[in-house]
Amino acid sequence: MAIAEELQQDITAWILKNKSNPLFLDELDEEQVYSYGVPKDVNGNKLNKIIILIREISLQPNLYGSNHAQEEVATAQIQFFYPNESDTSPLKDDNGNPVYYDYYRDIEKPILDYLHDKEGWSRTIGGGHDFDPDTEQVYSTYHIKKSVNYL
């Protein structure tokens, strides 16, 4: 199985375990995790869902034996696309004020931590949030890596 597909399965498993948390407002959906590309007919804003896209970036030989790579460092990219209404919340705090997402604390970091703890993926670069003017979505991008040993 390819790296992006393995990550897709792992992230899907995390979502299935955690999506009942009321904080996620039904915006986390295991069917909205994609590897390689998002189908053209999928629009996170219309679905009011968070879309997660995984891509493979590189495989770099790291350890050689008998003139053959025995280990490679795999790098993958994970992007989180948020529906443009995800900053509004029907949830209220004790004072009746709306509770908003902290994208990193509530969604991205727990998923990245899960991938690190379960499969040994380490975050290399990424984070920060940007706004896509074409889709009117907030998104973030992370690169993660791990060693793949063939011995």
Predicted features and spans:
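Broad gene-expression machinery/nucleic-acid interaction feature
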Residues: K49-I51, T75-Q77, Y139-T141
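Generic hydrophobic/packing signal
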Residues: F80-Y82, L115, E119
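Hydrophobic alpha-helical segments of small multi-pass membrane proteins
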Residues: Q77-Q79, D113, H143
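Small/polar-rich, solvent-exposed N-terminal microdomains that initiate assembly or binding
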Residues: M1-L59, L63-Y64
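Short amphipathic alpha-helices in soluble, non-transmembrane regions
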Residues: I11, I107-Y114
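Short, charged interaction patches at domain edges and termini
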Residues: M1-K17, I57-G65, A69-V73, D117-L151
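Mid-chain, well-packed structural core segment of small domains
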Residues: Q70-K109
